[in-house]
A protein has these predicted regions:
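Core sequence-specific DNA-binding domains of diverse transcription factors
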Residues: 42, 133-134, 156-157, 161-269
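Short, intrinsically disordered low-complexity segments
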Residues: 1-6, 78, 90, 191, ...
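Ser/Thr/Pro/Gly-rich, low-complexity intrinsically disordered stalk/linker tracts of secreted
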Residues: 25-172, 181-182, 196-198, 269
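Intrinsic-disorder/low-complexity, polar/charged segments
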Residues: 3, 140-147, 210-213, 251
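Intrinsically disordered and other compositionally biased segments
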Residues: 9-13, 81-83, 264
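Secretory targeting and sorting signals
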Residues: 2-27
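Intrinsically disordered, low-complexity boundary segments flanking structured domains
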Residues: 20-22, 96, 251
């Protein structure tokens, strides 16, 4: 049985900068310290977000820290304090030599001189969030001590700053269902409430009703979405009974609606 979705579901978050956490937990020595980010959750496509990255050394570090801003986020810059992506450093309890040394593309290099237990803050202003929702965009952070032979090493997985990106408010519905069926054969229809970027909407608690151009169709009753559904529900037991071309439409109580592409209903043999 062939199926069709009315909008492409974009799951290739890695291509947009969501880096698997495994990169920060590879075998071998890890970097020095921990970097924590706040807030930890933002909305896809939102603008004007201020993020604070707080670094704490777990042993003394005199050297450098690098942090890579994932693709899809506003590129960091120091040219204009009022422009998106502006970054600044607050030395906190680290030495006065701690500063932003350079920005090259999406990579910040920070000259770091922090004793054990000391730390600084990196402020990232007016950032635009990627339009693809993902469980974790990692701002990969690495450190190295002074010395020509020293190498950059990523912080431990638990010490990496990670931001979850969730979908925004619902602006439409999306249907996934068969485009060919036989009279009297049950099939399922999956209905997602989506934001403008086709992410599952958040939050969503609408009540969805299915209707059909087939007057003899058997359809499940209305369903009120729960938080555990994460804006997605599969309606089972849909049966079309009139041969020819039919459609199914999903509508929620707020007026969002989506009609399926044509469904070919073959007579039973």
């Amino acid at each position: 049985m062939r199926t069709r979705t009315t909008r492409a579901t974009l799951l290739l978050a890695a291509l947009a900068g969501a880096v698997p956490l495994a990169v920060a937990s590879a075998a071998g020595p890890t970097g020095i310290g921990r970097m924590v980010v706040t807030p930890t959750t933002l909305t896809a496509g939102s603008t004007g977000n201020d993020l604070t990255f707080s670094y704490t050394a777990n042993r003394s570090l005199t050297g450098q820290t690098i942090m890579d801003v994932p693709r899809g986020w506003t590129a960091p810059q120091r040219r204009g304090a009022s422009s998106p992506g502006y970054v600044e450093l607050k030395r906190g309890t680290c030495a006065g030599s701690t500063r932003i040394a350079s920005i090259a593309g999406r990579r910040l290099t920070i000259a770091t001189a922090c004793k054990r237990g000391h730390g600084y803050q990196l402020l990232y202003h007016k950032a635009t969030v990627p339009t693809i929702a993902a469980d974790g965009y990692i701002f990969l952070t690495q450190t190295r001590a002074s010395g020509r032979k020293a190498k950059f090493r990523p912080l431990a997985r638990s010490g990496q700053p990670v931001v979850k990106v969730k979908g925004g408010p619902a602006t439409g519905l999306d249907l996934t269902l068969t485009n060919v069926t036989t009279v009297g054969t049950p099939f399922s229809v999956t209905v997602r409430a989506v934001d403008p970027y086709s992410n599952n909407a958040f939050p969503y608690g609408g009540t969805v009703t299915l209707t059909s151009t087939d007057p003899a169709a058997t359809l499940p009753g209305p369903y009120a979405y729960q938080p555990s559904d994460v804006a997605q529900r599969t309606f089972t037991g849909v049966v079309l009974r009139t041969p020819g071309t039919q459609t199914i439409t999903a509508t929620d109580a707020s007026g969002l609606t989506r009609q399926s592409p044509p469904i070919t209903v073959n007579a039973s043999s």
